[in-house]
Amino acid sequence: MKAFDYSLVKDPQYFCDNRMEAHSDHVYYRDGNEMQTAVQDGTETSFRYSLNGLWKFHYARNYKSAVQGFEKEDYCCYDWDDIHVPAHIQMEGYDAPQYANVQYPWEGHEEIYPGQIPERFNPVASYVKYFTVPEHMKGKRLFISFQGAESGLALWLNGAFVGYSEDSFTPSEFELTDYLKDGQNKLAAQVFKWTSSSWCEDQDFFRFSGIYRDVYLYTVPDTHAYDLQIRAIPEENLDVADLEIKVKTWGKGSIAFRLEKDGECVLEEKKSLTEAGNEEADAEAFYIQKTNSSKTVQNSFVWKINNPKLWSAEDPQLYDLTIELYDEAGNIQEVIPQKVGFRRFEMKNGIMTLNGKRIVFKGVNRHEFSSVSGRHVSEEELRKDLRIMKQNNINAIRTCHYPDASLIYQLCDEFGIYMIDETNLESHGSWDTAEFTKDYTYVVPHDKPEWQSMMLDRANSMY
């Protein structure tokens, strides 16, 4: 059985282990009735099971002080403290929020070289959640999604090491199927405040740590779309648009599309996945360090849409796209609702244009932040932010300086707000030190090959 090696946390090349690769964040439902109920009542898809709530918790100032072996099945954690998930530990009474701009948060406390991590003070948050697999999920492949954990996450299930992930601002997902048992399961996680990747998370903001976004279990049907790419781009005359959909699927069967505008059907078509597939790849493309899984098929579809109503911040016209997947027997497997906006972005003579007209950005840099809960922002607070922006003629947001939780992207489509999504990659503290000392080997990531894979992974994870 593979074991977790904490010494690797200071290696820039160790940023994921057995973690699923990035994929689109679309929600899928069992059938149309479940989808309609969810849209009307705000209920969750039955393919997901939330683990939000109280978890057992232990805080340590550093790894040496953390409880060793707590992840084992026979280690009892019931007398530990309770902590809310999602939440920053600093907003729950452990450690303290720290604001820093260019300086790294450990400067003046411990001298370390880029890539290394503090040892005397580097808080470790140990979490435990006991759960039983819901009846309707039994017998299915089971996955877990941590939508945000800052900044390094190690995971165990029933004493077995599942995997590891860094990047504080994009999801970390793992398959749990091979580690499950009947009855109660023990899920254990350790979150490290600083890892080698923290050298590239030197943003101008408050420094927190912990599991601060949603956590949920999920299953997939036998025929499943795990990744979607939708491009809706008008031709230059804007009278006709190309609707291109790329979908990567597991399993065989068929796929159906229906595009509507204001209740009127614009497009309806059904295709065989086996006939439409134009690229077959081993599931290693979907996993990191995981083999023995089924094949995946990528399908591409393109349609011409006449006289499209165009999306802009001033007039955010959206179409309703419904995608249905069926197995080979014709049984519906999942239904995926998506909002689609047709718009044409171009650079003309050095000027950015949308739908043939010059864009005038009246925008703001927006941190994902609540005065009450830090970077765990409620839907109510987020909607309030966006309403105030629109009321004050703000039409653009830059997510400084990292990807936000998924909801804001959907809401910007609906509200009519241009979105500039920033990668979680900032290391200006190393530049200042190098400028002062004239030791430019201190700069990261620079041209150092050991940082390359981590950088590319962060760009690829920005779904």
Residue ranges and their predicted role:
Residues D178-Q184, K246-K348:
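Extended acidic/polar, glycine-enriched regions
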Residues D222-G251:
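Surface beta-strand/loop "capping" patches
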Residues K2-M20, D25, D41-G42, K56-N62, ...:
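Accessory beta-strand-rich segments of carbohydrate-active enzymes
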Residues S50, V124-T132, R141-F143, P171, ...:
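Intrinsic-disorder/low-complexity, polar/charged segments enriched in Ser/Thr/Lys/Arg/Asp/Glu/Gln
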Residues Q90-V133, M137-S145, E150-L157, G163-E166, ...:
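Active-site-adjacent substrate/metal-binding segments within catalytic domains
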Residues F47-H58:
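Mature N-terminal segment immediately following signal peptide/propeptide cleavage
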Residues A66-V85:
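Short Gly/aromatic-enriched secondary-structure transition segments
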